[in-house]
């Protein structure tokens, strides 16, 4: 009886009040997450999570800058500055952002760093800092272009270092990073993006999903398909003949957000990208999906 009464009382609460409570819970969860990221940053300005400091620092910085803070304003300004300082210090003469001697998958960190630093550049007002970022990103774009394989993808390392091996997840980091640079005013060769788009298409299976690699074809991967579709959207591709098939595949495999979805692995990676895909479909699809996804994430914090 108490449960029934509680349910009825809850249903009697106006929808607006319920929505307001829900949004407050999300905001509180986001703040707790951002505070945790800031608190766990090292004195050198990086994060590691046990490994891959360049990639983890770029991702941590991206989360902080998404809060609205910049290098000079907001509660996370200091942490963002330290992240930028760390990543720019890792820029090498050949343009790579990272350390190939300690990171055997440096392409991830390079791509995530291009994405993060290009967002910082878009908000940066300090003239000297802007000049430094432009130099670092211009070199980074050049490195990425030269690291692309003959097939149009990227591997865990450059084409030269990796004997022309490529695969989907690293390719996606490069395309998003390059797109971020282009949006920030850094010149990006159009042919590099075109080759990358065609690479994604070559990895597409008949069910609409994307396989691991163009050379090592296999079953479709929900995570890579979601990331590839988000990347195509970021590259300005919405109506290509391949996009509807990929969208249908991701909706079938990912839209339910069930616990069983974890069977394909990399759950958080998957929904980082699939949420971008759904957001592009408009409020009617995004709102109910967002509610379910946010509530699940908050419940696991």
Region locations from a protein language model:
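An alpha-helical repeat/solenoid feature that recognizes helix-turn-helix modules
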Residues: 1-32, 46-79, 92-194, 202-293
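Large, well-folded core regions of big proteins
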Residues: 38-41
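Short, intrinsically disordered, charge-balanced linker/junction segments flanking boundaries
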Residues: 300-301
């Amino acid at each position: 009886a108490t449960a029934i009464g509680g349910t009825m009382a809850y249903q009697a609460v106006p929808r607006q009040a319920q929505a307001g409570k829900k949004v407050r819970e999300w905001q509180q969860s986001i703040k707790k997450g951002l505070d945790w990221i800031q608190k766990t940053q090292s004195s050198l300005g990086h994060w590691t999570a046990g490994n891959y400091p360049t990639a983890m620092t770029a991702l941590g910085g991206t989360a902080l800058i998404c809060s609205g803070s910049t290098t000079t304003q907001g509660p996370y300004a200091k942490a963002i500055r330290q992240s930028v300082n760390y990543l720019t210090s890792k820029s090498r003469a050949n343009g790579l952002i990272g350390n190939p001697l300690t990171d055997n998958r440096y392409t991830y960190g390079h791509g995530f760093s291009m994405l993060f630093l290009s967002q910082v550049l878009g908000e940066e007002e300090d003239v000297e800092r802007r000049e430094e970022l432009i130099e670092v990103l211009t070199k980074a774009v050049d490195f990425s272009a030269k690291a692309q394989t003959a097939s149009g993808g990227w591997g865990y390392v450059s084409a030269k270092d990796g004997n022309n091996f490529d695969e989907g997840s690293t390719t996606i980091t490069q395309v998003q990073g390059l797109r971020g640079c282009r949006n920030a005013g850094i010149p990006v060769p159009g042919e590099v993006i075109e080759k990358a788009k065609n690479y994604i298409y070559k990895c597409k299976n008949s069910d609409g999903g994307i396989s691991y690699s163009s050379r090592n074809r296999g079953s479709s991967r929900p995570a890579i398909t979601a990331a590839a579709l988000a990347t195509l959207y970021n590259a300005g591709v919405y109506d290509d003949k391949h996009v509807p098939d990929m969208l249908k595949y991701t909706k079938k495999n990912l839209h339910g957000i069930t616990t069983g979805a974890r069977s394909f692995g990399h759950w958080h990676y998957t929904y980082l990208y699939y949420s971008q895909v759904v957001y592009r479909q408009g409020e009617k699809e995004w709102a109910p999906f967002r509610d379910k996804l946010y509530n699940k994430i908050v419940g696991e914090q």
